[in-house]
């Protein structure tokens, strides 16, 4: 599941003009993907967004390996229909926004495993993410959590690896947490939630973050927008793209304030602009400007809490 920030270059109109709203607004591309011999289930509006990150990872891997190289995503390209690969509704910025999330998550995961070599990675709303394949070190245990329909489809493209456990269920319940603690009672855990929390009310997200505190030795990293960014998402994005059925709610103005709302001794470890660590070499001027505007006003950010 994913939200991608939009550029301010006028989309496909060729018109350039600075619009701060467009620097954070996302496009949802609803696609049907079929594997031979498999009928894809009907996904709801939120589930349908799982295809956007795959397109971004493939695009970056083909054109901007300095941002992200994803061999597994490339290997799946020929299994996807041409209709999905026709990215006319997106542009360089929207595609690289998805790839940038993956690059950011990789950085946090690798840092966590350097600090906690016995740690576990749990991906919430994993969709068709290929994070495991980019970061597998040969011994770390991974868990991937998503809804049943999504997980069933994921298995057709990405069969369950030896060191990654697929868990079909509600990311906001404690079932997957209990499973992890049965398997590894005391191991440190990094929970990642890429492009997920936007779709849920604040109290729902806070309930999950508080629940993590109850299971001990847990950290969570996720991407978010700030209040002004969310306002733009609601005002422009849904009406423009005709996807009002995929509503968005959760935003973070201050990671420190979020930690106080969580309570339970939670603390904000990091809050950083989304594109801070992204190599912008070779990008179009409009893409660079969009990234710079987003970072200047902290419209999109990475948040790390434990």
Enumerate the language-model features and the residues they cover.
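Conserved catalytic loop of SAM-dependent methyltransferase domains
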Residues: 266-293
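A short, conserved alpha-helix within the catalytic core of class I
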Residues: 199-211
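A conserved beta-strand element that flanks and buttresses the S-adenosyl-L-methionine
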Residues: 191-192
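Rossmann-like AdoMet
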Residues: 31-122, 126-169, 180
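Short, glycine-/aromatic-enriched active-site segment of Class I SAM-dependent methyltransferases
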Residues: 231-246
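Short alpha-helix
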Residues: 247-271
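Short amphipathic alpha-helix with an adjacent loop that forms part of the alpha/beta core around
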Residues: 175-185
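Conserved beta-strand signature within the Rossmann-like core of class I S-adenosyl-L-methionine
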Residues: 216-227
């Amino acid at each position: 599941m994913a939200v991608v920030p939009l550029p301010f270059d006028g989309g496909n109109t060729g018109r350039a003009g600075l619009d701060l709203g467009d620097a954070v607004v996302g496009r949802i591309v609803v696609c049907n993907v079929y594997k031979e011999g498999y009928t894809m289930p009907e996904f709801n509006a939120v589930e349908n967004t799982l295809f956007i990150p795959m397109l971004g990872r493939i695009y970056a891997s083909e054109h901007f390996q300095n941002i992200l190289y994803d061999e597994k995503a490339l290997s799946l390209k020929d299994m996807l229909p041409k209709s999905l690969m026709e990215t006319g509704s997106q542009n360089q910025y929207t595609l690289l926004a998805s790839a940038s999330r993956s690059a950011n998550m990789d950085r946090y995961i690798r840092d966590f495993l350097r600090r906690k070599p016995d740690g576990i990675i749990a991906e919430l709303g994993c969709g068709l993410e290929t994070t495991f394949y980019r970061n597998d070190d040969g011994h770390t245990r991974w868990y991937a959590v998503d809804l049943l329909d999504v997980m069933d489809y994921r298995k057709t493209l990405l069969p369950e690896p030896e060191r990654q456990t697929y868990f079909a269920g509600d990311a906001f319940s404690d079932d997957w947490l209990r499973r992890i603690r049965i398997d590894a009672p005391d191991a440190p855990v990094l929970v990642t939630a890429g492009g997920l929390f936007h779709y849920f009310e604040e109290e729902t997200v806070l309930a999950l973050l508080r629940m993590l505190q109850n299971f001990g030795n847990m950290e969570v990293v996720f991407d978010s927008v700030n209040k002004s960014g969310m306002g733009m998402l609601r005002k422009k994005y849904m009406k423009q793209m005709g996807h009002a059925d995929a509503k968005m709610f959760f935003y973070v103005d201050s990671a420190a304030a979020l930690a106080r709302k969580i309570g339970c001794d939670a603390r904000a470890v990091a809050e950083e602009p989304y594109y801070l660590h992204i190599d912008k070499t070779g990008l179009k001027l409009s893409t660079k400007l969009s990234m710079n505007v987003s970072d200047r006003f902290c419209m999109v950010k990475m948040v790390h809490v434990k």
